[in-house]
Amino acid sequence: MVVVSQNYPTPDLHRVRRALLSVFDKTGLVEFAQELHAYGIELISTGGTSESLIAAGLPVKDVSEVTGFPQIMDGRVKTLHPLIHGGLLGVRDDPSHKAAMEKHGICGIDLVVVNLYPFEKTWQSGADSQTIIENIDIGGPAMIRAAAKNHAYTGVVTAVSDYDVVLAELKQHNGCLSFSLRRQLAARAYEHTAAYDAAIAAWFAQDLEVEMPSWQNFSGHFESMMRYGENPHQRAAFYRTRDTRFGVATAKVLQGKELSYNNMNDADAAFELVAEFDPQRTAAVALIKHANPCGVAEGQSLKEAYLKALMCDSVSAFGGIVALNQPLDEECAAEIVKLFTEVIIAPDATEAACNIIAQKKNLRLLITGGVPDPRCGGLTVKTLAGGVLVQSRDNAVVDDFDLQIVTKRAPSQDEMRDLQFAFRVVKHVKSNAIVYAKNSATVGIGAGQMSRLDSARIAVHKAEDNAKRMGLTESLTRGSVVASDAFFPFADGLISAAEAGVTAVIQPGGSIRDQEVIEAADARGLAMVFTGVRHFRH
């Protein structure tokens, strides 16, 4: 711990006499430096930054002129010198600091303008390890942290977007920066270096295949404030992380009202579900409400899939999210706008489809640029009071499972197709989850119940109600198959499904009463498949 024996008054306004500029991103650099020069501010710079300023006709002192020491080791050592860091860290009102600065010829630096080597961009480009390591900035973060620590006297700029803010203050205060701004810039500086170091740590963890490192860092760039969170009394914001997985975060909002917290959460759930279906093989549509599906279907076209999905629960679909695994086309768009919908999320959209959606000015249309790979790894995070739960993404795909037929009767080809379809869907339903499906479409969904039997009954009840609305004489579950996200702990859930008219069952298995459940299935002529994989979702 450093003990300061005397407190010195922090100047509210501090004149900027000397600025050090060393940037990788040279956007707006020359114009900014020209304004600094107009205030009589001495410019110190390094390498390529110095060359850019000299080319623009600005008087610049190279760092090596200040230090009397050339840059060495391919530029790795340029600013790591007492004559630079003394100028950044010196407390101007401390007599001992002033004496040391005078003794060693250290000039105070009042403004530091630094942005860093593009480490994350280099990592994401697929560069080799050596190139990535060479893009770990050392001198830049050191200067940023030093200037931020000494923000009582030194301003630090780490973002091009802050150039105008600084210039406005210099104009307002006749060449001075206020303590308020210096403190704000210092806070942003530490946010910047923390995120930079977090990215480096994440790369090393990935490179060394350390899935759960001793320290886990989560960083994201502020993207936007939201009107509120899940409820109006909660504040919320959206932060973009380094994850490039296609979805809400990568999406362009082509039209519609501002996205809410719940819109984004639901759209993410919807798109992750629909991504379970290969867009090269089939068209698929998912309808989501409160992060749970109320209808999912495959079809030869998006229109067919949408209409099949809507049949599952058209009441709950009102005011929901529509997710597509293929580009939105004119025919599907024409159907979607017939029902009030909050958000459409798709990998792309045709011009004709966009024109139709434009008729509903409040309807948000999100274009993601692609469909995420359901097999792709990654981490999911859940916050707790005083901690964070981290787990690998549930990237198990039913196509890859070694399915075990455990009943006397094997499922038919059509039943097996529907069983696999239903198990794709049940993966994305809140536990306890039960999904009834027929002809590659859900016909009943039971979600989020404490009892698996209750989930099964709710799914049947909704299917029966929907059949009545459609004028049908029997439940939609007749002739369907059923999927369960976890094993049936007792035979009652399976018996309930059999009474609803199912012909085949897919579930993980693994209960101590599996044999009892198998016998109940055999007694009712059901085919049953064990996946060996559970899909709890909370």
Curated annotation (Swiss-Prot):
Q: Which family does it belong to?
A: Belongs to the PurH family.
Enzyme Commission numbers on file? 2.1.2.3, 3.5.4.10
A GO CC term assigned to this protein in UniProt = cytosol
Quote the record's domain comment: The IMP cyclohydrolase activity resides in the N-terminal region.
Which positions fall inside the MGS-like domain?
11-158
Instruction: Tell me if Hydrolase is a UniProt keyword of this record.
Output: yes
What species is this protein from?
Answer: Bartonella bacilliformis (strain ATCC 35685 / KC583 / Herrer 020/F12,63)
Q: In which pathway does it act?
A: Purine metabolism; IMP biosynthesis via de novo pathway; 5-formamido-1-(5-phospho-D-ribosyl)imidazole-4-carboxamide from 5-amino-1-(5-phospho-D-ribosyl)imidazole-4-carboxamide (10-formyl THF route): step 1/1; Purine metabolism; IMP biosynthesis via de novo pathway; IMP from 5-formamido-1-(5-phospho-D-ribosyl)imidazole-4-carboxamide: step 1/1
**What is the name of this protein?**
Bifunctional purine biosynthesis protein PurH
**Alphabetical list of Pfam families matching this protein:** AICARFT_IMPCHas, MGS
Question: Per UniProt, which keywords does this protein have?
Answer: Hydrolase, Multifunctional enzyme, Purine biosynthesis, Transferase
SUPFAM superfamilies documented for this protein: Cytidine deaminase-like, Methylglyoxal synthase-like
| Signal peptide limits | none
Reactions accelerated catalytically: (6R)-10-formyltetrahydrofolate + 5-amino-1-(5-phospho-beta-D-ribosyl)imidazole-4-carboxamide = 5-formamido-1-(5-phospho-D-ribosyl)imidazole-4-carboxamide + (6S)-5,6,7,8-tetrahydrofolate; IMP + H2O = 5-formamido-1-(5-phospho-D-ribosyl)imidazole-4-carboxamide
GO BP: any one term: 'de novo' IMP biosynthetic process
Molecular function per GO: IMP cyclohydrolase activity; phosphoribosylaminoimidazolecarboxamide formyltransferase activity
Q: Which domain of life is it from?
A: Bacteria
